[in-house]
UniProtKB/Swiss-Prot annotation:
It catalyses: [protein]-peptidylproline (omega=180) = [protein]-peptidylproline (omega=0). The keyword Calcium does not apply. The gene is cypB. Its EC number is 5.2.1.8. Inhibited by cyclosporin A (CsA). It comes from Streptomyces anulatus. Pfam families: Pro_isomerase. This is Peptidyl-prolyl cis-trans isomerase B. Residues 3-172 form the PPIase cyclophilin-type domain. GO terms for molecular function: peptidyl-prolyl cis-trans isomerase activity.
Length: 175
């Protein structure tokens, strides 16, 4: 069996193991892995300074919508931040939002991917062709963590959790 690439989001609510899909979205997976491991330079939106810090460590899931998705990856933690660059979408004909627990890029329209991502908690077919899918939650334990985060009480105006859900670190490994 061929080796697979995994990213584990270690959160204050438990671990979410994700099987990444580099054969379907190679640029997106590379961007995510390099930001997660400190191998890609990014610009801190708060200071304007270049950084090779691990972007996702210490960030929060800033937007949580029960029955839909959980969103994170913003270095500012409010939905407005990113890495200081944007890149194109990668849509693969074999991938659509026909099942829950998919990892995809959040964006503000075509070609605006950066660092923000979301995990779905239900099929969301209307997102197919609008957001790059680049992974899927690989096990029942991680799916339960995603579901628990999605059920977190939020501010009804902003969809932000009332208590921070923190991505403490991201571990990337091939196995």
């Amino acid at each position: 069996m061929a080796e697979q690439l995994y990213a584990t989001l270690k959160t204050n609510r438990g671990d979410i193991e994700i099987r990444l899909l580099p054969n379907h979205a190679p640029k997106t997976v590379r961007n995510f892995v390099e930001l997660a491991t400190g191998q890609r330079e990014w610009v801190n939106p708060e200071t304007g300074e270049k950084s090779t810090d691990r972007l996702y460590d210490g960030t929060v899931f800033h937007r949580v919508i029960s029955g839909f998705m959980i969103q994170g990856g913003d270095p500012l933690g409010n939905g407005t931040g990113g890495p200081g660059y944007k890149f194109a979408d990668e849509f693969h004909p074999e991938l659509g939002f026909t099942q829950p627990y998919l990892l995809a890029m959040a964006n503000a329209g075509p070609g605006t991917n950066g660092s923000q991502f979301f995990l779905t908690v239900s099929p969301t077919a209307w997102l197919t062709g609008k957001h790059t899918i680049f992974g899927e939650v690989s096990g029942e334990a991680g799916r339960k963590v995603v579901d628990a985060i999605a059920a977190t009480p939020t501010n009804p105006r902003t969809d932000r959790p009332l208590e921070d859900v923190v991505i403490e670190s991201v571990v990337v490994e091939t196995r």
